């Protein structure tokens, strides 16, 4: 066997010296060499952004393999499946290279063996490993190796709801029913449902599942905070802290003021109250027996109204400023006194109710424990589990079976983990159990820990960091701070921000010289002043921003988008490719607005959502559920998915009417009962639903019969054709991609059957196994531009790098600061457990005739949990900004919005330890405010970024510009080109078939799909292409020509507002309009603002006419039946071409219709100019008949009322056709 000794510390130092003396262009740093070769102890590598941690891991693994450690003797945990695949690929490539350089047969044989074992080595996510372990050893817990992973959220929710409902009923009827009702009411209030209580139970359950031992956590930690809470003690501590804190500061402030005020404002009446307050405060600080509560109330009485307020009107400007400063500071002190008084009141009430809260929460604890157990039993019965179950099974197997744990410890030479900062406590316990105590290699960066929402705990990394830093015998700490990604302009700006912002208090780590980014190469240090980091702020009036627009999910403003577009066009003109530019957004709420604006300016933009899983694409999921339902209609999930799909369009009301036909049983049985009207409530099955049921049952029966004697490939195409589903997705956004996905599904089914496997059931089973394993079928190539600007979330960008980066919405409020942030009725903390708001009845404490006087009180644990959660949330936001800023290679832009006047004046110059004060950092609610506070407090030369406010005048269309598009090639210029003999022969052949083409023109020119607009020649007189003017029909009219001329668009021309553009905008407005009992002009204006059209086009939309429509009988009918309204509804149907007698598909979009019980009311908006309504009635008679026929066939309903809503005349007209 191949064996080589590992390097000693002295040999590692020698390697470091040799590397330093080498003439390599890019040398390994001493820390990288240490990380690659150190051994014999636990190692924590703190790797800053761009420091080459993946390179270090690969080199370390290769070094161990080169010393005789087999790849199967390593446990390597990655954060994602993709990262595992990339690591395996790198290792295989490098080992193959080493194999070619091997000098001995023994070495070649060993390396060949390692390459062969890469596929089965333990390199992957922790989820993948635990599944593998439970598959092998699950029998020790009674878990079958054929278990299935529940990846469908709907399936999980349904099973949880069933368990919860049964348990809830048991508790409502149990011995503690009265206390349980009080518990439920505490969280549901006056709600008629227990949903709020159910959400609490689910949240506690989910939180516990992220711990290493959920049952232990529920028993020991869930109520820990409440058990340890001592309101009386907290009250005394609060009062004790008043003397040396708030009251002493208030006294010093009043004394200073009185000395000046008696001279400058000698006759002011408020000074008597100031003197009395000073006397009270001085007495309290001298006398230890002072009743602090009584003192507090006296001070608040003195300061009530204008008691301590300086109401004088000095003429001197300095005195005026002094007066205002005094009043402001005084008000702040009084506000703090009132806050203390409120806290004392709450603590007093909590003291009286503390004995009532704990029994109630103990009952909640019992409920959650019972729910957790019964939910697990339900999953065991179905042999289907969640990822967290498998992880806990794996922990139990290793803890309860020492021989299994020892076998793994003996197997692994090293236990390695990447992205260690994002580990959960469950994962950490697994690593402890697999390790022998001194063979762990952990790589990560706490500054990039951004996954708390996945229960990752950065404190795990931090504890290890501090332990190894303070006690080297416990393990070796290696810091990789050299950055090999970014230019010095990006690194300097990042260091400038976080050296003044991040520390242990906020951010969880002290950002000092130890953690500062350092350029790893000389080339990175070369100055490029033009690439200095820019903070670009769209200068807007804050009063124009409502509270509803603020918060974590606020929309991006048009000014910010214009600002970004202008900078991108400038970069493009300088020769920067679009693919080198990336936009980083806090979430996907901004995507639509950005895509619309970028398209208007001719800039290609690709959001990350394009790179979605093939099996998770909506159209493929619908087809898979269709196949599942055909294979087994008793599969409730698949059946309901098929019913709800666009193929059958059952809505929630329809499904409810079906569900009430039986108390229990499968949904398919209820559906059949509804169809035959033999269920419990046949009266609720109306005519429209009855027609839907008939169509569905007949179609499903037909498909099931067809599947028995035809291939899956043929079945899939029959489904596409029977319900026009393939055509339907062709009318949706990204139609080409969707149709390619559906086409690929049919091809893959065909390929599957060619391997010898037959049957729908087997095919579905194969797909389900792929999904359960977390894998996917090979993606169909995305039909997106290659040279395009990228758009992704900051979370998605982690681990990636881009030349030019725009960080968007710097003004977005953090979750902890938004009005919805931490305002719920409970907060869960890992250490202190559950903190709640308690609904206390104060009737006995307050003299009142009311039957109850309920007041919501924040328990001590709730307050403590909120403080910790808020601080943890702000720290993660700071780390998220660090991730965003360190993605850039060349230049970084930080983009936001705000008032220049406010942002430049609201922060002071106070600093603490060369950082912004902790209180200020904690109070600030946005990235932008952090940046502006730094800009005010520190010198620009220390920050290395510039702040520029951009005005509306700089964002006019002329100032922004447009992407230049190369002129189209003029076909006439090619007329004299030389022609080869092959081209001449081809032209001859083409000319010879011209006669045949003319003879069979109707059939040849017949497209497989037509729209109603293309069929106007079937049912109306001759008309122009715009469909505006009706002309006299002439003899000898030639057939419709289908010339193949393709004119390239001229992007340089000035946009001309056409009638078609106004019509499209009007249609989109009516589609986007939110309907209520009444429609106002404001509603229409808001809907118009969301229309994706130019301002010139929007200006031509006649809102007054549209508003008048809702005063007509048809408009009132629509408002009264909003739940039955369908808008912009796609349809497809077969029709016969009169010339060729060939069938073709008619496909189009219906503006809208009402699906009533006895009839369908169809309507269509027309913006054509007219002098008399009868003109348009005649013109669109055939088109409306076509729509009516399609609806009649789809819903099996004969009566269809047809209306045209005419907007192109002097007055609005509603005409029945």
Curated annotation (Swiss-Prot):
SUPFAM superfamilies: P-loop containing nucleoside triphosphate hydrolases, Restriction endonuclease-like. GO terms for cellular component: cytosol; DNA helicase complex. Belongs to the helicase family. AddA subfamily. Disulfide bonds: none annotated. Heterodimer of AddA and AddB/RexB. Gene3D superfamilies: 3.90.320.10, P-loop containing nucleotide triphosphate hydrolases, PCRA, domain 4. The gene is addA. It catalyses: Couples ATP hydrolysis with the unwinding of duplex DNA by translocating in the 3'-5' direction; ATP + H2O = ADP + phosphate + H(+). Its cofactor is Mg(2+). Keywords: ATP-binding, DNA damage, DNA repair, DNA-binding, Exonuclease, Helicase, Hydrolase, Isomerase, Nuclease, Nucleotide-binding. NCBIfam families: addA_Gpos. It holds the Pfam family UvrD-helicase. Its EC number is 3.1.-.-, 5.6.2.4. It comes from the Bacteria. GO terms for biological process: double-strand break repair via homologous recombination. The heterodimer acts as both an ATP-dependent DNA helicase and an ATP-dependent, dual-direction single-stranded exonuclease. Recognizes the chi site generating a DNA molecule suitable for the initiation of homologous recombination. The AddA nuclease domain is required for chi fragment generation; this subunit has the helicase and 3' -> 5' nuclease activities. The lineage of its organism: Bacteria, Bacillati, Bacillota, Bacilli, Lactobacillales. Residues 515-799 form the UvrD-like helicase C-terminal domain. ATP binds at residues 47-54. One of its GO terms (molecular function) is double-stranded DNA binding. This is ATP-dependent helicase/nuclease subunit A. Residues 26-487 form the UvrD-like helicase ATP-binding domain.
